[in-house]
Amino acid sequence: IKFCRDKRKVANVYLDKEDTCHHLTGYITACNDDEVLIAHINTRGEYDGFVYEYASNVYRVDYDGEYENKIGTLYKLKHQSHPQFEPDEENILFSLLKFAENSKLLVSLEDEENSVTGFLKSFSDTQIELETVNEYGKYSGVTVIDLEMVETISVDTDYEQDVKLLADNNTENGSVC
């Protein structure tokens, strides 16, 4: 993982031994012994936000293969880029959350069975509080979740971008998001 970060290589990061078709593709933005932050790129070689994972969930990393090279080439040919921010290598998660909060980006928190999406209200060493927004961009309450229950955190992926567009549209049209 560190090699891919240091050499700026597009990597495929695998998290589920039971489902090898599911992987995250992109540049490793930051990593340490416990955390990995991926500047995610979709299957069309386009910007797809950031995905945070616990390093212990990663069981395989591929790089320099045909697929990774294709995605990297498309990303360059399409003049794609990720917003620049300098995550603190000692605390990648909080760097990402501060970036999302300051940029007013939607965040999705996933556990084994569920996911919740929303705007950050607050966060601490033990929990995250979101103003939740449903898939239609409508405000749906407040969720407080224990960080120990969260497996994956996504910021500004295609899904969050679409929901944010809907939420912004609802707000502009006088609806409560």
Question: What residue ranges belong to the model's regions?
Answer:
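N-terminal mature ectodomain segment of secretory-pathway/periplasmic proteins
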Residues: 28-36
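Short aromatic-glycine-enriched beta-strand elements
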Residues: 35-38, 126-131
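Short glycine-rich, low-complexity segments
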Residues: 1-23, 37, 42-113, 134-177
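Short beta-strand-centered aromatic/proline hotspots
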Residues: 22-29, 116-122
